[in-house]
Amino acid sequence: MGDPKKPRKKWEGPRHPWRKEVLVQELKLLGTYGLRNKRELWRAQTIVRKFRHQARSLLAAPQEIREQAEKALLNRLYRLGLLHENASLEDVLGLTVEDLLERRLQTIVYKKGLARTIYHARQLIIHGHIAIAGRRITSPGYIVSREEEDLVDYAPTSPFKKSIEEKA
């Protein structure tokens, strides 16, 4: 059976935690995307940082190794909805944390008009009123792929869905 893996942090905080411009920018992002704490923001920054690091190392790699890995990375980022179809590694280097935060379920629920505010979207998700293709998702930080984006709706058993059907 084996030993369980050691749980590791999935984020890395800022190197200088008290720089005013960093604090102001983080606070603005927390409010814009309805994040609960800075750890959620740092997790997104870490994911983007890893993608960009991967792209930089691929740009430095020899051509025969680079082609297959580059195609896999670009395909993955396209499926996540972070890049357009004909993107290159230079586009990966231009990714920002806002690009990733736009793909969170919380943001997509708000942008689709299923919630009145970004905070309301978070509450709907946590309380189980939101589903993707009929499957209930209760994590506001869930990264919605390009295929799933059109399938985001109220859960089948949600009273919100029933009230909309009655109005129609």
Curated annotation (Swiss-Prot):
Pfam families named among the record's database cross-references? Ribosomal_S4, S4
Q: One of this protein's GO BP terms?
A: translation
Transmembrane segments annotated in the record for this chain: none
Q: Which GO terms describe its molecular function?
A: rRNA binding; structural constituent of ribosome
The record's CDD domains line, in alphabetical order, gives: S4
List the Gene3D superfamilies. RNA-binding S4 domain (3.10.290.10)
Q: Which domain of life is it from?
A: Archaea
The GO cellular component terms are:
small ribosomal subunit
Instruction: Please report which protein family the annotation says this sequence is part of.
Output: Belongs to the universal ribosomal protein uS4 family.
NCBIfam families noted in UniProt: PRK04051.1, uS4_arch
Q: What is the recorded name of this protein?
A: Small ribosomal subunit protein uS4
UniProt gene name: rps4
